[in-house]
């Protein structure tokens, strides 16, 4: 089976590929841009994007909308994560948290799969924001996020390690389980 992943982010593709490879599913990147609406939740953003793409893309596809939610910043950047990453970057988040004791944060990932109907899969990982960036793996906010139970950032892990515990890994697991049940 081949699965089209609509995304502009090669880091996401790499993670989905590594996740699905052992299951005999090939993931390929489909670079079609779609509107990301301003909404309160990742689910709404993902659902709107998937329904918009459904009118324009042939065959099944999935997309992933993710965000980093920092407790001391009342959930910011959350649904604005892509914009914040492009503008102030992870250095900007570190600056906002300077001197802050509460470093708790979580990542959330929403996968929307369209096969004529919409299917939503989600995953979350709790952790904290590091005081300085570490590691060169991964992408995005990975150098400043330390998952609970670890003392390394996501950027200091291999893709396989990150997949085992990450928001996206968990959403991919739900997605893969659903495919197993529904493609018989
Ligand atoms: P799409 O084309 O798939 O939308 P994107 O990078 O814009 O790619 P999102 O809107 O979902 O993706 O991402 C929001 C931001 O959060 C973006 O800057 C990502 O780099 C970052 N991000 C998403 N998942 C991440 C992860 O697993 N680790 C670190 N940063 C992540
Ligand atoms: Na995006």
Curated annotation (Swiss-Prot):
Active site: 65 (proton acceptor)
Residues the record lists as binding substrate: 7-12, 66, 139-142, 162, 167-168
One GO-annotated biological process of the protein: nucleotide metabolic process
Pfam annotation, one family: Ham1p_like
GO cellular component: cytoplasm
Major enzyme class: hydrolase
Catalytic activity: XTP + H2O = XMP + diphosphate + H(+); dITP + H2O = dIMP + diphosphate + H(+); ITP + H2O = IMP + diphosphate + H(+)
EC number(s) per entry: 3.6.1.66
CDD domains per record: HAM1
Cofactor binding summary note: Binds 1 Mg(2+) ion per subunit.
Signal peptide: none
Superkingdom of this protein's organism: Archaea
Cofactor(s) listed: Mg(2+)
Residues binding Mg(2+): 36, 65
GO molecular function: dITP diphosphatase activity; ITP diphosphatase activity; metal ion binding; nucleoside triphosphate diphosphatase activity; nucleotide binding; ribonucleoside triphosphate phosphatase activity; XTP diphosphatase activity
Family annotation (InterPro entries): dITP/XTP_pyrophosphatase, ITPase-like_fam, RdgB/HAM1
Function: Pyrophosphatase that catalyzes the hydrolysis of nucleoside triphosphates to their monophosphate derivatives, with a high preference for the non-canonical purine nucleotides XTP (xanthosine triphosphate), dITP (deoxyinosine triphosphate) and ITP. Seems to function as a house-cleaning enzyme that removes non-canonical purine nucleotides from the nucleotide pool, thus preventing their incorporation into DNA/RNA and avoiding chromosomal lesions.
Subunit structure: Homodimer.
PANTHER family membership: INOSINE TRIPHOSPHATE PYROPHOSPHATASE, INOSINE TRIPHOSPHATE PYROPHOSPHATASE/HAM1 PROTEIN
UniProt similarity note: Belongs to the HAM1 NTPase family.
Entry protein name: dITP/XTP pyrophosphatase
Organism for this UniProt entry: Thermococcus kodakarensis (strain ATCC BAA-918 / JCM 12380 / KOD1) (Pyrococcus kodakaraensis (strain KOD1))
């Amino acid at each position: 089976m081949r699965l089209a992943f609509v995304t502009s982010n090669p880091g996401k593709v790499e993670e989905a590929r590594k996740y699905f490879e052992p299951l005999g599913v090939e993931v390929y990147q489909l670079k079609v841009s779609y509107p990301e609406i301003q909404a309160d939740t990742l689910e709404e953003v993902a659902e709107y994007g998937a329904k918009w793409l459904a009118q324009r893309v042939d065959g099944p596809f999935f997309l992933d909308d993710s965000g980093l939610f920092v407790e001391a910043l009342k959930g910011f950047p959350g649904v604005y994560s892509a914009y914040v990453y492009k503008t102030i970057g992870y250095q900007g988040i570190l600056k906002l948290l300077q001197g802050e004791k509460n470093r708790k944060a979580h990542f959330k990932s929403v996968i929307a799969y369209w096969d004529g109907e919409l299917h939503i899969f989600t995953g979350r990982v709790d952790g904290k924001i590091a005081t300085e960036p570490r590691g060169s793996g991964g992408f995005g906010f990975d150098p400043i996020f330390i998952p609970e139970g670890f003392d390394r950032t996501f950027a200091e892990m291999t893709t396989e390690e990150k997949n085992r515990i990450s928001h996206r890994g968990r959403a991919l697991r739900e997605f893969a389980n659903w495919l197993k049940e529904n493609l018989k």
